Amino acid sequence: MSITAETAKAHAHDPAVLCCRAEAGITIEPANLEDPAIFDDLVDSGLLNLDGCLTIEEVLGAKLTKTCDSLCPLTDDVLDGVKAPTTPAEEKAEEEAPAEEAAPAAPVATAATVAGGTLKIHIGEGKDINLEIPVGALGTTGEAVAEVPAAVAATATAEAPVEEEKVVGTLTRRHIKITDVQRGPETKIEGTTLYIREGIEAEVIADQELVKDFHLEIITPDQYHTYSETIMDVQPIATKEGDAILGEGATRVLDGVVMMLTGTDEGGVQIGEFGSSEGYLDENIMWGRPGCPDKGEIFIKGNIVVQEKTNMERRGPMAAHTAFDIITQEIREVMKELDDSFIVEDEELKSIRRPGKKKVVIVKEIMGQGAMHDNFILPVEPVGILGARANVDLGNVPVCVSPLEVLDGCIHALTCIGPASKEMSRHYWREPLVLEALHDEEVDLCGVVFVGSPQINAEKYYVSRRVGHTVEMMDVDGAFVTTEGFGNNHIDFASHIEQIGMRGIPVVGLSFCAVQGALVVGNKYMQYMVDNNKSESGIENEVLGCNTLCQEEGIRALAMLKAAMAGEEVKAAEKKWNPNVKSTNVELIEAACGKKIELVDNEQSLPMSQKRKEKYD
């Protein structure tokens, strides 16, 4: 792809290579040259040899003496009028500061009354400060200004008072402990045992025309080595108290148990794309990830079979999630009726605004391509169905929410992308970047913006422009852009970063990249990037949650954004994925903060599955 004059200037000392076939006799312009950003890969693959290649600054304005094909390096033998190379400008040495002297008297300011009754004061030293004060406000037509020592003048302006932190929202999670799950004649909670009504399966099947079969299992820790179809979602079991709405008031949540949805279509095809996590549960779950189960938890696992060939259509996964929520909602209704004796802990979350600190926003890109790629936003109940809107139906445009709405289950994730980088519903309930930013006293988190990733490129750029304007209106000092998955959604992921960056706002991007998810698009604003990869080989290994955003990425991203907002240098990444970059950055942050960063395990800590053995390891 050809470059612009601006790019040519920025890459003046990089190799000059034709982007397209060029006829003899033309004068070389930026439009004739290829973007140097792609050269490393071409050289590595043997498609490009840069030996003897001139630089961009040398060839601009020169005459091509021979017709050349695309990707032809420009050398002396095909050009006439090559310019002499220049040395890259070196940084100027800092000027030595003059010795501090006693503060001299400030020069006498001149004052004059002008037509219209305005007093003009001009101070010639410093930055040519001009003050205009209505004479009437002074009660005089102008007086000589007394000479004031400069040191005194410098302190004349009173310091602006520092505004105090302000709590703009509180959310209380009320924890109910569950140690056992059984089937019984009715859904109820007795002590620490949850009973699920026998026969509820028939209602799940009857609720949705596309649901053809449903099987409910209770998986206890001693049954983790049980075969399962691909895991579509992991969900907390939570409900609002009284009239409280999402993100406010009190939310009751069951500890020790999660909902797990799995499924196929009638033909046995997994409901997933670019990988699936079917197999033994203990071999295919990355325990403790924000979106995954924790070891020791009980799974209420529902396996749904949808109509054949609807697994890749929008209606198939939607029907599966909607039907499965019948069970969760019945549990929610029981939770609402429990008295406070069942509450074992109250956890208070606060949304705090910090005036005077750097204001930041988190932009989270979620899937919105249609088919199986969709999400429900802002249901009535945490991670519920009722009242929610699909982001595809909303046009994938930005939706602004509070941090507490995120942590209260405002996203019901329908997405069936590759398991390793999929952010499940529970991920948002425990969203690590939101939690890190909320608790960091050095930044002012103003909110979270969810934006869908459309399928069509024109729609992607339309949505990205909305993101840019939304963030600009917030008047923030910095932004994060995160995404799950990789591939098609990286087009708008890069565009979001560009739209924010071009408005002068430093922005840090977070995504699974590494080897398999390496970005195929980019722009000059993508200079601050954090890779979510944790897999040994840098790939989508089909282990649930392996390469999702964790606390360690939240810490690294915050450190990088702070550096960017302060104007500090952030070194460019190496041209190939190198896991040592992450470890080096972690060590630097630990040294600066004096605090150990706990890194999570990867798939090597799990028993080896047959799939991993055959396909990956």
What are these regions, as identified by a protein language model?
Residues 475-476, 480:
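Proline-aspartate-enriched helix->loop->beta-strand connector
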Residues 356-452:
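Membrane-embedded hairpin module used as a gating/binding unit in multi-pass transport
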Residues 534-567:
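Extended, charge-rich low-complexity interaction segments
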Residues 489-501:
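Short Gly/Thr/Asp-enriched flexible loops that form oxyanion-binding sites at enzyme active sites
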Residues 367-369, 482-492, 513-516:
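Gly/Ser/Thr-rich loops at beta-strand to alpha-helix junctions
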Residues 514-532:
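Glycine-rich, charge-decorated loop segments at or immediately adjacent to ligand/cofactor-binding or catalytic sites
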Residues 430, 454-468:
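A general structural motif
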Residues 1-391, 561-617:
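Long, compositionally biased, glycine/small-hydrophobic-enriched stretches that function as flexible linkers
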